[in-house]
């Protein structure tokens, strides 16, 4: 199984990587964030970052640090014959990066300048949480980058970045150029 985990800062283009690989290269795309959003809806909770973090922490405590990867792989295995591989977006805990590697997969880190990312998030208005100040955006990002050192189930994106095999910068707004750069990088790793 070809397995790609995608991590990165908010608004950098993690879902874009998944969508490109699904549309242009036949991968199944699963957003871990969408799994968590669905669980919020199931529990009648507002879809807010604090609830997403709480549920992901709960699942990690119950099922291990790689549980979100395992949930996505389980979904993939139900229809794998229809796909070239699995791409998962929004890895935010180092146990998820470790699990991707244990399964023979590759981790990609996607990043962009904080102002570029803030403007993307603010303009898309995916949820009411996207309507925040730049300072709030940076504060939340800091919390997610470094997590709680006393809680291995917390978000710790800085360590996920360190464990990534490929770093992609997505500074522009030209999705075709980004898709071409992504494809070239993945070909060099024999993933396309």
Regions inferred by a protein language model and the residue ranges of each:
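P-loop (Walker A) phosphate-binding loop of NTP-binding proteins
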Residues: 9
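Small-molecule kinase domains that catalyze NTP-dependent phosphoryl transfer to phosphate-bearing small molecules
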Residues: 126-181, 185, 192
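ATP-dependent small-molecule kinase phosphotransfer cores
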Residues: 28-87, 91-98, 127, 135-139
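Walker A/P-loop
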Residues: 15
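ATP-binding Walker
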Residues: 12
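Conserved phosphate-donor/acceptor-positioning beta-strand/loop module used by diverse small-molecule
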Residues: 89-90, 101-132
């Amino acid at each position: 199984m070809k397995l790609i985990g995608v991590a990165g800062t908010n608004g950098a283009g993690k879902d874009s990587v998944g969508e490109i690989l699904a549309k242009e290269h036949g991968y199944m795309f699963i957003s871990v964030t969408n799994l968590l959003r669905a669980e919020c809806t199931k529990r009648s909770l507002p879809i807010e970052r604090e609830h997403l973090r709480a549920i992901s922490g709960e699942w990690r405590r119950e099922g291990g640090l790689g549980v979100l990867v395992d949930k996505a792989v389980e979904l993939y295995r139900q229809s794998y014959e229809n796909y070239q591989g699995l791409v998962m977006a929004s890895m935010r805990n180092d146990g998820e990066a470790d699990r991707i590697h244990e399964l023979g997969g590759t981790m990609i880190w996607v990043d962009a300048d904080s102002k570029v990312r803030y403007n993307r998030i603010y303009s898309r208005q995916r949820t009411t949480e996207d309507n925040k100040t730049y300072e709030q955006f940076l504060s939340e990002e800091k919390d997610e980058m470094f997590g709680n050192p006393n809680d291995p189930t917390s978000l710790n994106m800085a360590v996920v970045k360190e464990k990534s095999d490929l770093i992609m910068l997505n500074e522009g707004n030209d999705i075709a150029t980004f898709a071409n750069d992504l494809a070239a990088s993945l070909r060099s790793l024999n993933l396309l």
